[in-house]
Regions:
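Strand-helix-loop interaction patch of compact alpha/beta domains
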Residues: 1-57
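Compact alpha/beta protein-protein interaction domains typified by the UBC
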Residues: 34-99, 108-112
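Domain-level detector for trafficking modules
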Residues: 87-98, 103-144
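Glycine-rich phosphate/adenylate-binding loop
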Residues: 143-297, 422-426, 430-596
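N-terminal charged helix/coil linker that caps or initiates catalytic domains
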Residues: 273-334
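Glycine-rich adenosine-cofactor-binding loop
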Residues: 322-365
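Glycine-rich phosphate-binding loop and adjoining beta1-alpha1-beta2 segment
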Residues: 363-399
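A structured beta-alpha segment of the ubiquitous adenosine-cofactor-binding alpha/beta core
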Residues: 389-425, 431-434
């Protein structure tokens, strides 16, 4: 027997002894009873009788990971509590929630404490307490009571108003967006082009007060009464849907919980349920008895049934971000110049963060030598980097409203279209080529209208011993202020006695994906701060690799860095350093125009 199996056997034995000594009338659950509760023979359990006039049982269940997991409890013979707060499907009690911690060295104490918590919850539910939890965790209680397995996937703005929206009816799910254009863009990004997709009206109803389970509608008539009682101006939107829908329509309820979180719940409304007769029966007319178009919406609703369904929010990831950041970034436009190992990873981080419009620009093809440190893999070799990245990112991040590839250099792009970068909120130059980036810097300072946005330059020092993110605006210090005329930085962070070999294609860059990750995060983080107005150019941040990384390649901290910014010692740190204007820099001689 393995170590963990032995530990479990010992823990279960201790719990069994505690149950026998503590709970009168308790019974061990046999395999058949465990299966009836949705568990297999790898579980152990007991039936613990509940005292009091209402009786019933409490099932104590230990999973295969016990004692390195929490005990579970489920109600038995208590149908009166199956819709009570903190009671989940099949009577399971929600006590500690996901991720609850246990004293894994004292299984009996954990079970005893959890048993007391379960009894306290049952007593509170019997007394009618905890009802405010329905509004705190509304979406979870709605999911508990769904009556149709078809989910609604939504991508909707959290606006506190009712309105008609657009729906695509698929076989596996319905997709709901603010309008047909947004729905088509998301579906095309995720699943590819399909010209046969059709879109229908759906209703989004803002509820000023979220309902408790006994008010959850089980037909369209009850849904209408709920809207009438709980939604300001939601009834005209619902009635319009009732008057114009065909066989089936979707309704999304949206509201704010007691903690301020915006939640969604779904409803499918359809025609009357006619039993199948095996023959072609006439289609029931929900408007019978009225002239066409004159049936009252209340009658149309009463004659239709509804099903509660789960809502799967395709923007749920925004809930893992700081409030409002995702919505702000969704409206930003970014251009990424250079889609190598650095640029590809930064682009991915920005899309994951919610940036809604992005153009990737790179003339080069992806080679086998970069498979180990690029977002692309071996299936993309010999393809243009920008094009391959866009094709990969579109289904991964369908929320992006515009994701475009330009398989050329930025110079060629601007010769073809001088306003190609005109509307960008931020330009990221991750080319790592002094000639191209000094040209971009001079163009920004030229006073023309081709580059209006701030430019965020990012580069790695040799062997990824340090990484730099430098934001330059139309005024103040420029890129050249910190470099010599041929692109040698004035104050490098590292020095390398043994340099990488240089061939006709330029120097070989020695670093792997792990070395690259902090640099990508550094640049993406500053990009987000710039887009959200939390930082402004000129600003430079640097990542200094752990000292053993330098030592492995024979590198060390550069004396000039130590003189200016102090000794990094063991490294492994992020630092912000000045980027002062150089009075002798040529930018002082160039015409400068400040663009708002």
């Amino acid at each position: 027997m393995s170590f963990l199996a032995t530990k479990r056997q010992q823990a279960v034995g201790l719990v069994a002894a505690w149950v026998a000594a503590t709970v009168e009338g308790a019974d061990r659950l046999n395999p058949a009873l465990l299966r009836a509760l949705g568990r297999d023979e790898s579980w152990d359990g007991w039936r613990l009788p509940l005292r009091g006039a209402r009786g019933g049982d409490l099932h104590l269940l230990l999973d295969p990971e016990f004692p390195y997991s929490l005990p579970r409890f489920a109600l038995g013979r208590r149908t009166d509590l199956l819709r009570a707060p903190h009671v989940e499907t099949k009577g399971r009690l929600c006590l500690a929630g996901d991720g609850g911690r246990a004293d894994t060295l004292d299984p009996v104490a954990v079970v005893a404490y959890s048993f007391g918590e379960a009894l306290a919850l049952i007593a509170e539910d019997e007394a009618g307490a905890n009802r405010e939890d329905y509004a705190i965790d509304f979406d979870a209680y709605w999911r508990r009571d769904v009556t149709d397995p078809l989910p609604l996937r939504t991508c909707l703005h959290a606006e506190r108003r009712s309105r008609l929206v657009s729906a695509w009816h698929g076989q596996a799910f319905y997709f709901i967006a603010e309008n047909a254009r947004d729905a088509r863009t998301w579906l095309t990004n995720r699943y590819g082009v399909d010209e046969t997709r059709a879109f229908k009206n759906a209703a989004l109803i803002w509820l000023d007060r979220l309902p408790e389970p006994e008010m959850y509608p089980d037909n369209a008539g009850r849904a209408r009464r709920l809207i009438e009682a709980s939604s300001y101006r939601g009834l005209p939107v619902f009635d319009r849907l009732m008057a114009t829908m065909a066989d089936r329509a979707a309704v999304v309820f949206m509201g704010a919980t007691a903690t301020g979180d915006v939640v969604q719940a779904g409803l499918l409304v359809e025609g009357p349920d006619w039993a199948s007769t095996g023959t072609k029966a006439p289609k029931p007319n929900v408007s019978r008895g009225f002239r066409p178009g004159n049936a009252p919406p209340s009658i149309l609703a009463l004659r239709r049934r509804s099903h509660r369904v789960e809502v799967q929010r395709t923007d749920a990831w925004l809930g893992r971000m700081r409030a409002g950041e995702g919505a702000q970034l969704a409206g930003k436009r970014v251009a990424v110049l250079g889609c190598g190992s650095l640029g590809g990873g930064v682009a991915k981080l920005l899309l994951q963060s919610g940036v809604g419009r992005m153009t990737l620009i790179d003339p080069d093809t992806f080679a086998w030598v970069n498979v180990g440190r690029h977002e692309l893999g071996s299936d993309s070799t010999e393809r243009n980097k920008a094009t391959a990245l866009v094709e990969r990112f579109r289904p991964m991040y369908p929320h992006a409203r515009e994701l475009r590839a330009e398989p050329t250099s930025w110079q060629v792009l601007l010769r073809r279209d001088p306003k190609a970068l005109h509307d960008c909120d931020l330009i990221l130059s991750l080319i790592g080529d002094w000639n191209a980036e000094s040209a971009l810097n001079d163009l920004q300072r030229s006073g023309t209208d081709e580059v209006r946005a701030a430019i965020l330059y990012g580069w790695l020092e040799e062997q990824a011993g340090a990484a730099h993110a430098l934001a330059i605006g139309p005024t103040g210090a420029c890129l050249r202020c910190g470099f010599g005329p041929t692109g040698t930085i004035h104050v490098p962070a590292t020095t390398w006695p043994r340099h990488a070999p240089v061939g006709c294609g330029g120097p070989t860059s020695i670093y792997g994906a792990v070395d690259l990750a902090p640099a990508q995060s550094l640049i993406a983080s500053l990009a987000i701060d710039l887009l959200l107005g939390r930082a402004s150019p000129p600003i430079r941040r640097a990542w200094l690799a752990p000292q053993p990384t330098l030592a492995q390649g024979g590198g060390c901290w550069h004396l000039r860095w130590i003189e200016h910014y102090g000794d990094p010692l063991q490294g492994g740190k992020l630092t912000a350093t000045p980027w002062p204007k150089d009075a002798a820099c040529s930018c002082a001689l160039l015409p400068v125009t400040s663009f708002s």
